[in-house]
Amino acid sequence: VTTTTTDLWHHYGRIRTEHDRAVPHTFSWLWNQNGGPGPEVLGDLTGKVVGDLGAGAARHAAHLATHHAPARVDAVDASPAQYAMAIDLFGHLAPRLRIVRSGVVKHVQTMADTYDVLYSVFGAVDFTDPSELLPSVAVALRPGGRLLFSTLAHYLGGAPAEPDVVPADVPARTPNGEATTMRRWVLQEQTWTKVLDESGFTQISVDRLPSTTSAPRSADTLFVTAVRRA
């Protein structure tokens, strides 16, 4: 999750936070957060340094910090509102969970050769120019470190993903409720493969995971993994 001077994530997750304050027992990569692969695809995280890029309220990061024995999980998000929710919900998990308020590009640019694993669940990879973000992510990973992320396989209205690295303007709300837009990158499989290769990654894999629901605004998920070149 990324933001500009106006926090366009101010409202996101607030209702859930009012009634669900527990560390999640599950971790899903799917758009509807129900089924599909789980944290096992991250590999053994014991003693590893992990980062969640665009962590929102840090629910996925809290799950990993609690159940998978990493040395540290950094939950990084630029939104003041999401940062505040994450601190409120999971601040007690420090120091294993480190909640960081920062733009993701700015953060990873200061963390060269730090992370064993970086991941994003419909987070910063969706809302940041990949040609700017992904080279910085590669530098923040240790040689051989892994990037894993889930992203939309198509637009929520059903339109196909983009063949080029171009964003679309999608609906958003300002903190006072006014309608606005933000940029989101919804790219085809081969487009992600190309931009990852150009950004310093190898062993690139892109899998399309079908939606497990027929609810309105459901979507298939692209699950992408890549390794930083040594």
Predicted regions located by residue number:
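A short acidic, Gly/Pro-enriched loop at the edge of an enzyme's catalytic core
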Residues: 109-118
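A short glycine-rich, Lys/Arg-flanked "PGG" loop and its adjoining helix->strand segment in the class I
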Residues: 131-146
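Class I SAM-dependent methyltransferase SAM/SAH-binding core
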Residues: 51, 57-106
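A short SAM/SAH-binding and catalytic strip from SAM-dependent methyltransferases
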Residues: 117-131
